[in-house]
């Protein structure tokens, strides 16, 4: 969909002198049209970029139902950018990171994104969170030609069609690919299992189910869906128990991992649990469950023992991983206190990839150049993610694969190597790439 | 002079004249604003339309609805459904009218049920409605579930651009187009509502609000008047929802939380119950205040999360302060002060 | 069959929580003729206070008592400091005042206590009870919830039916002028009504939170369904609140387990509309609508 501006009008004259006077008076009184209407230079659009700074915008749920957990992601990004800025910035430019709250409400996302793009004049958006929320602004960002990098959501919408949304790039492994990788692992390793699905009632659950059914359609005996923020999930888990599912795959958020574990304990229901990457977070869920042991859950921390999951990033509990060590050091020097969490790690990893793209783009930073860099070089970027990003001219999807892991004693242990795949009928292959190590100072080198 | 005064005394004439003047002023103001301010003006327009409708319902007929967000959802989804393809089946104005009609019908059904109930029971039922409608569209197929429906705003019609250009000398871009639409709709709605409030129907409503038993003895059919007020307010909410879909560009369940209904109610309260000017003022506050407060919070050194939470704190406090200190609302209190001064002089 | 019983028991405990919340609304309605929309955020705040105490002392019961006491104080403070000034004015003013308080408390709690999930311990086992080799889908805490609601119900009925105080409270709410003439200290009664209601509200908060997660929005679904339960039963009747809560809890549990979780809100609306169309004053409205 293209919109044409009709320049012909500029040569016409408005109706009367009185009208002109009024326009003048009102323009003086109100805030006149500002720099937003300026024409980009021939070399490309440098909105938001000066010799000393780059303005980057982000929208996250800082308030409301989605805020617990997600509101800490931008703290991670902020810490990383502060660290980069303390070390001289990128080509001498400091990153000015502006976070706005959208309360996970598309209406608010729309208004704060307007504010970021039209008023604050950001160079790019980074890590804007949520499927329905970002859906509200993706057309606006693309028609305004604002780079929309690393959307914080695993929907395939963010990158499967670069022709439709040439300025939008995904980041994490999409839910469909994750479903496929989990499905294949189950088909290979637990072919007799009666699989029950515990799904969040939205695109997250639906894409996951689609991917799973590519491999274990016949093994699925029950599907239960919950609405986040709704009533108690006892009836959902009871339905899975009634169908005698002995392996439950959960496409749910971390709070519902804790809640489903508590319900299962109440029902004396002990299937093998397999939570997706989004829902597992052993540090968060484990600490939530461990706190109950002060009450009467005797084995709170061990509740998660033996739970399967997937990972596209190292877990913060894996302190021997060099990326975790590097990010932990940065968090200690520039973070906002407390131990590094997986949410903050997520934000830092996005920020790292963004700085990587800025470094690779070079000194002459424009919006067009940044997108060109990601399409041409983004596929070769190495970082904390296990598998490469799928960035190219044909796909803007994020990292392409994950490991199957198991939680043991609060630690995440690898079960498989890195499995990579893509949406649609792409096969799953074991990645041969060796794990990368971070640069010594934690900042991707300039080219 | 007396002739002019007499004509001015006819509410319809007065409202139409004010409407035309307002239209011209609005055209000039919008054309002089930046795209960001235009987007905010669009938000203010749909909030004001919904608040205007709620003013009639709550301020005039004394019924409390905690679920008007549901009717915005009805209007928004109708518009989104008709605008999900690049080639809309109907002209935009017709789509907006269809949205009003659908909200009107749904409002009629709910209104008939609500008219039988007293205060807290209406509140309970409408609160349940505010939660039920978003959940229902999530459940039904064809409405895009959680992601909602994408709204493709039709291109600005050439004749529209021409007219605006002729008057103001400024081009119409897609963002300001929605703002123009919103404010034109707002002016039309407010003229209609203002006339209604001045009419016999309006007086009936006030009588009902102040003393329903006496009103009934005086021969007013309680039920019919209540339903009419309800339907009028839901029609306004439907129009507001339609404009909301156009300005947000998506209609998704998460866009219609219970907070939305409470927000609308607070817009009515902030300005003053029963006054359309108050509704306008209240929606202006709701549009511009959160951003100002949040920015003030971050510049005062609060964390992002804290400054984001600050906006609701401030508007909740203002809401309480208005009720405690100036129950007639800002507009009502100013009017009283003005009348007192004139009385003294 | 097992699924049926599990869903039934789940619905009962869920319903008991709604009933507790509805009882708080009913209490305040009986003693002041006001619907307190800030009930849930007030309970949320007191639950957080309780959690702070539990976390620092390690004693659940101390936290429990402190939370209830905090409710008593908060209720009285809100009545004395805010509601007092709009009493006798239009009903709408009080409603809007409590809605304003709703918004403020919600955000203040997020600022003061943070946005994170916190786990709220329970004093009893969170495992299903074992009876004769069978696992019952109800925890020790679930049983506690049911008993707590029953006790509150009995106390409330006793208060209004058998004590002088209850009579005075009702009289103050129903007709302040007459009550004043009869020597009732109306102001004190209203304060007491708010304070007691807030205690019951705090209890509801503790029952929702126990053995589950606490965050500033954790009472949100109770706001709607607890209110619906109260209205369903007829705001004026404690028995109605309990029945309304249990009916709603069971219905929502079965719809959620056997149909779809997205149909839960529309079911609540459907039940409410159906009941109100037959009995506009709720299930247990025995008094005909008051006429002037």
Please annotate each region the language model reported.
Chain A
Residues 1-55, 430-447:
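Short, low-complexity disordered leader/linker segments with a strong preference
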Residues 116-129, 147-151, 195-199, 244-254, ...:
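Periplasmic-binding protein-like
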Residues 333-344, 355-414:
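Segments of small-molecule ligand-sensing domains
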Residues 40-78, 100-107, 129-130, 198-206, ...:
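Extracytoplasmic "Venus flytrap"
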Residues 264-348, 440-441:
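Extracellular/periplasmic periplasmic-binding protein-like sensory domains
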Residues 40-44, 68-75, 87-161, 171, ...:
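Beta-alpha junction/loop-to-helix N-cap segments that form part of ligand/metal-binding clefts
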Residues 107-111, 155-157, 164-268, 318:
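Extracellular/periplasmic Venus flytrap/periplasmic-binding protein
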Residues 38-58, 89-94, 187-193, 364:
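Immediate post-signal peptide segment of exported/extracytoplasmic ligand-binding proteins
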């Amino acid at each position: 969909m293209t919109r044409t501006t009709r320049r012909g009008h500029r040569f016409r004259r408005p109706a009367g002198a009185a009208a002109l006077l009024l326009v003048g008076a009102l323009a003086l009184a109100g805030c006149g049209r500002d720099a937003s209407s300026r024409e980009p230079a021939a070399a490309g659009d440098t909105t938001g970029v000066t010799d000393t700074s780059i303005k980057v915008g982000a929208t996250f749920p800082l308030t409301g139902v989605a805020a617990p957990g997600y509101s800490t992601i931008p703290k991670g990004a902020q810490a990383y950018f502060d660290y980069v800025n303390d070390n001289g910035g990128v080509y001498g430019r400091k990153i000015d990171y502006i976070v706005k709250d959208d309360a996970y409400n598309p209406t608010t996302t729309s208004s704060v994104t307007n504010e970021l793009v039209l008023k604050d004049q950001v160079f790019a958006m980074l890590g804007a969170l949520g499927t329905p929320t970002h859906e509200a602004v993706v057309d606006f960002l693309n028609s305004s030609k604002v780079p929309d990098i690393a959307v914080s959501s695993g929907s395939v919408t963010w990158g499967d069609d670069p022709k439709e949304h040439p300025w939008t790039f995904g980041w994490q492994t999409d839910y469909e690919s994750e479903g496929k990788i989990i499905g294949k692992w189950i088909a290979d390793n637990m072919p007799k299992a009666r699989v029950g699905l515990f799904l969040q009632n939205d695109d997250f659950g639906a894409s996951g189910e689609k991917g799973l059914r590519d491999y274990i359609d016949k093994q699925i005996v029950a599907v239960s869906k919950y609405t986040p923020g709704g009533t108690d999930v006892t009836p959902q888990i009871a339905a899975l128990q009634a169908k005698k599912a002995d392996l439950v795959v959960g496409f749910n958020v971390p709070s519902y991992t804790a809640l489903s574990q508590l319900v299962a304990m109440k029902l004396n229901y002990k299937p093998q649990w397999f939570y997706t990457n989004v829902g597992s977070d052993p540090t968060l869920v484990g600490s939530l469950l461990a706190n109950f042991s002060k009450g009467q859950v005797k084995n709170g921390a061990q509740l998660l023992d033996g739970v399967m999951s997937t990972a596209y990033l190292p877990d913060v509990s894996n302190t021997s991983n060099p990326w975790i060590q590097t990010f932990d050091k940065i968090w200690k020097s520039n973070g906002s206190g407390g131990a590094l969490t997986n949410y903050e790690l997520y934000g830092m990893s996005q920020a790292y990839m963004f700085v990587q793209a800025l470094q690779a783009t070079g000194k002459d930073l424009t919006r067009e150049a940044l997108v060109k860099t990601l399409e041409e070089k983004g596929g070769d970027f190495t970082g904390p993610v296990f598998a490469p990003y799928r960035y190219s001219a044909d796909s803007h999807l994020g990292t392409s694969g994950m490991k199957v892991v198991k939680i043991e004693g609060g630690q995440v242990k690898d079960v498989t190597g890195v499995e990579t795949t893509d949406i649609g009928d792409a096969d799953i292959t074991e990645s041969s790439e060796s794990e990368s190590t971070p640069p010594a100072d934690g900042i991707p080198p300039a080219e | 002079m007396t002739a002019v005064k007499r004509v001015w005394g006819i509410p319809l004439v007065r409202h139409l004249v004010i409407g035309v003047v307002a239209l011209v002023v609005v055209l000039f103001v919008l054309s002089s604003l930046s795209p960001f301010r235009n987007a905010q003006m669009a938000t203010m327009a749909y909030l004001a339309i919904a608040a205007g409708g709620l003013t009639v319902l709550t301020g005039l007929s004394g019924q409390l609805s905690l679920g008007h967000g549901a009717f915005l959802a009805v209007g928004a989804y109708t518009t989104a459904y008709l605008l999900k393809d690049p080639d809309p089946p109907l002209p935009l104005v017709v789509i907006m009218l269809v949205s009003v009609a659908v909200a009107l019908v749904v409002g009629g059904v709910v209104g008939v049920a609500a008219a039988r109930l007293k205060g807290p029971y209406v509140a309970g039922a409408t609160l349940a409605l505010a939660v039920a409608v978003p959940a229902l569209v999530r459940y039904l197929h064809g409405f895009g579930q959680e992601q909602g429906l994408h709204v493709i705003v039709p291109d600005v019609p050439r004749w529209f651009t021409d007219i605006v250009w002729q008057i103001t000398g400024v081009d119409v871009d897609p963002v300001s187009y929605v703002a123009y639409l919103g404010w034109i709709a707002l002016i039309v709605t407010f003229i209609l509502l203002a006339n209604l409030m001045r009419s016999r129907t309006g007086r009936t409503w006030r009588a009902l609000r102040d003393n329903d038993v006496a009103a009934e003895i005086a021969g007013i059919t309680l039920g019919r008047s209540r339903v009419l007020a309800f339907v009028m307010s839901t029609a306004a909410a439907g129009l507001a929802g339609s404009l909301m879909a156009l300005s947000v560009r998506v209609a998704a369940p998460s866009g219609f939380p219970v907070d939305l209904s409470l927000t609308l109610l607070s817009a009515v309260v902030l300005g003053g119950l029963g006054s359309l000017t108050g509704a306008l003022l209240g929606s202006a506050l709701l549009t511009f205040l959160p951003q100002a407060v949040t920015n003030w919070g971050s510049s005062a050194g609060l964390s992002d999360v804290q400054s984001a939470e600050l906006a609701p704190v401030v508007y909740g406090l203002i809401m309480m302060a208005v009720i405690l200190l100036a129950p007639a609302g800002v507009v009502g209190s100013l009017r009283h002060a003005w009348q007192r001064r004139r009385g003294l002089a | 069959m097992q699924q049926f019983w599990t869903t039934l028991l789940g619905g009962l405990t869920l319903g008991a929580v709604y009933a507790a919340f509805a009882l708080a609304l009913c209490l305040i309605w009986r003693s002041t003729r006001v619907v307190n929309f800030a009930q849930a955020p007030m309970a949320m705040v007191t639950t957080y206070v309780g959690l702070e105490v539990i976390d620092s002392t390690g004693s659940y019961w101390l936290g429990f008592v402190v939370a209830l006491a905090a409710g008593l104080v908060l209720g009285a403070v809100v009545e004395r400091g805010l509601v007092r000034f709009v009493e006798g004015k239009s009903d709408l003013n009080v409603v809007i005042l409590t809605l304003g308080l709703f918004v403020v408390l919600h955000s203040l709690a997020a600022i003061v206590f943070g946005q994170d999930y916190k786990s709220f311990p329970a004093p009893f086992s969170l495992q299903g009870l074992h009876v004769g080799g069978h696992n019952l889908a109800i925890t020790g805490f679930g049983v506690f919830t049911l008993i707590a609601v029953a006790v509150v119900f009995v106390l409330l009925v006793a208060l209004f039916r058998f004590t002088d105080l209850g009579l005075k409270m009702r009289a103050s709410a129903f007709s302040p002028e007459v009550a004043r003439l009869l020597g009732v200290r109306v102001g004190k009664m209203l304060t007491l009504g708010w304070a007691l209601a807030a205690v019951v509200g705090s209890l509801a908060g503790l029952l929702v939170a126990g053995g589950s997660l606490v965050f500033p929005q954790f009472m949100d679904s109770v706001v709607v369904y607890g209110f619906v339960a109260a209205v369903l039963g007829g705001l004026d009747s404690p028995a109605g609140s309990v029945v309304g809560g249990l009916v709603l809890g069971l219905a929502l549990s079965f719809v959620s387990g056997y149909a779809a979780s997205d149909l839960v809100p529309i079911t609540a609306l459907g039940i409410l509309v159906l009941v109100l169309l037959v009995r506009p004053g709720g299930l247990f409205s025995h008094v005909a609508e008051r006429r002037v």
